[in-house]
Amino acid sequence: SGVEVHVEVDTGMGRQGVRPGAPLDELLEAMRQAGVGLDGVFTHFCAAEVAHSELTQAQERRFEGAVGQVRTKGLSPKWVHAGSSSSVDNPAQDSPWLVELAKSVGARAMVRSGIALYGYCLVIEGGASVQPRVRPALKPVMTWKTRVLDVRDVTAGETVGYNATFTAAGPMRLAMLPVGYADGLRRELSSTDAKPGGWVMIGGQRAGIVGRISMNLTMVDVSGIEGVRIGDEVVLLGDGVTADDHARLAGTISYEILCGVRAG
């Protein structure tokens, strides 16, 4: 048919792909009969960010077996890939292993760097002795901005936001932003009287989030930033505030923060 595909082998992720052994043999035979070519074979590690992971080592062995099946069938894919951004960053993962495995079927090795293209990568788990290979050099490239919708003053004792979770301790100047959790600004970044929340950047300075983030509105403290006006640019993600900052406050990972940003 002239069609060529990449076949995913489920070596332990348990999500998608064909299992090694008989299921893989059956798929390769069905592809042969249908005239479908094998351009690549790959797998996905479930714990790539964990140093010296026994799970990853077991997956590597299963993938070696699967590539061996491909070789036994006399197939010559162009690509063999099993790496993610965390695989590239994790010093405990043996990069030459993948290269040699690819060579065994006359293929080239490839890594699938996804989140690293945005300048982010999960912290490698495994103790202080583990030195990441690429994470220190990464720089976030995604910027998310909005503009000041309104500016208002509040006096001591006034409350701000739903359920009055924030009470002004003294006079404050607040800026209202036309963005909220419907746009991907996580509600966990809200602040209360007892707990500071997240922040945005206005004029190169931090402006802390005040009260609860609403569906499409957020209040921030600009008391210490001189001359804030309606229409001023506000950085939600960028210089001075990263997806890692949001993730830490929201109890999640930068991947979820970046995927959650929606165009207004």
Predicted regions mapped to residue ranges:
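Active-site loop/helix belt of alpha/beta enzymes
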Residues: S1-E4, V9-R147, V154-T155
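Small-residue-enriched segments and motifs
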Residues: T146-V148, A207-G208
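C-terminal accessory subdomain/extension
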Residues: D153-G264
